[in-house]
From Swiss-Prot:
One GO BP: intracellular protein transport
Name of protein: Vacuolar protein sorting-associated protein 26B
Pfam families: Vps26 (PF03643)
UniProt entry keywords in alphabetical sequence: Cytoplasm, Endosome, Golgi apparatus, Membrane, Protein transport, Transport
Family: Belongs to the VPS26 family.
Length: 303
């Protein structure tokens, strides 16, 4: 029985290393099992190069029908778990059919790779980039090894970045004017603004500003929308008086935000909203939601 079990054990160990692995930045990424691992960070147009090492276990040889390494960009919907939609697929053949008796190393390179989308792990969808090594075998089954990488892409400062101004209210009860300094914010930005009370005829308990993320997956009748409240910031406690102005100052850096994603490969979108919530003394809630655009600014760029 032990002999039979041993027959199905992998015959070799496969490792993947990057050429610039010692100097390349590593970022934390949450795995499917909930644990966090450090993963190398890349950007679109980077060259991805390194070595694949295949080492047979002692006393074993690896008969194979070829060795290849693939760079895959994939989208996985969690309602269709296990099925990946490839939007990037590059292949390098590393070896022709044969046998491996001892440690063998294969260099590989994918030059200036276009990686248009950022890595994203959401509620119902994930977008990932992965290196996949395949040692193709027949009856024994192919041997696979994966190495994930994180992709983040920077955007320039927007040429036009209008402020957001709106008047909202309940007829003859409440009339407010709110203003945010911009409509587009980078991930380390500060939201500045003010809430101005033009008319107050109801007793207010408090007022909060929320950051909400709305993830849409699928299309048409099969669209599924998931909304998360990522931050809640109290602006006011108690009832304001007519003419009162409440300042808004909300730092984005402490929160787990991503850039806005619009219709990624016709599979999903991620949008962000500022949600103004007013609660009166009878616990009735009044909302006003406004979409904002988030983008990733290079860390040495200034706003």
């Amino acid at each position: 029985m032990n002999y039979l079990l041993g027959a199905f054990k992998p015959a070799c160990n496969i490792s993947i290393t990057f050429s610039d692995g010692k100097n390349r930045k590593q970022v934390p990424m949450k795995k499917e099992n909930g644990q966090t691992a450090l993963v190398p960070l890349f950007h679109s147009q980077d060259t991805i190069s390194g070595k694949v090492c295949i080492e047979p276990y002692q006393g074993k040889k690896v008969e194979h029908n070829g060795v290849k390494v693939e760079l895959l960009g994939q989208i996985e919907m969690y309602f269709d778990r296990g099925n990946f939609y490839d939007f990037t697929s590059l292949v390098r053949e590393l070896d022709v059919p044969g046998e491996i008796y001892e440690r063998k190393t294969y260099p590989f390179e994918f030059p200036t790779v276009e990686m248009p989308y950022e890595t994203y792990n959401g509620v119902n969808v994930r977008l990932r980039y992965v290196l996949k090594v395949t040692v193709t075998r027949g009856y024994a089954g192919s041997i696979l090894e994966y190495q994930e990488l994180v992709v983040r892409n920077y955007a320039p400062l927007p040429d036009i970045n209008n402020s957001i101004k709106m008047e909202v209210g309940i007829e003859d009860c409440l009339h407010i004017e709110f203003e945010y300094n911009k409509s587009k914010y980078h991930l380390k930005d500060v939201i500045l603004g003010k809430i101005y009370f033009l008319l107050v005829r109801i007793k207010m308990k408090n007022m909060d500003l929320e950051i909400r993320r709305r993830e849409s997956t699928g299309a048409g009748a099969n669209t599924h929308v998931e909304t998360e409240t990522l931050a809640k910031f109290e602006l006011m406690d108690g009832t304001p008086v007519r003419g009162e102005s409440i300042p808004v100052r909300l730092f984005l850096a402490p929160y787990d935000l991503t850039p806005t994603h619009r219709n990624i490969n016709n599979k999903f979108s991620v949008k962000y909203y500022l949600n103004l919530v007013l609660v009166d003394e009878e616990d009735r809630r009044y909302f006003k939601q406004q979409e904002i655009t988030l983008y990733r600014l290079k860390e040495d760029a200034s706003s």
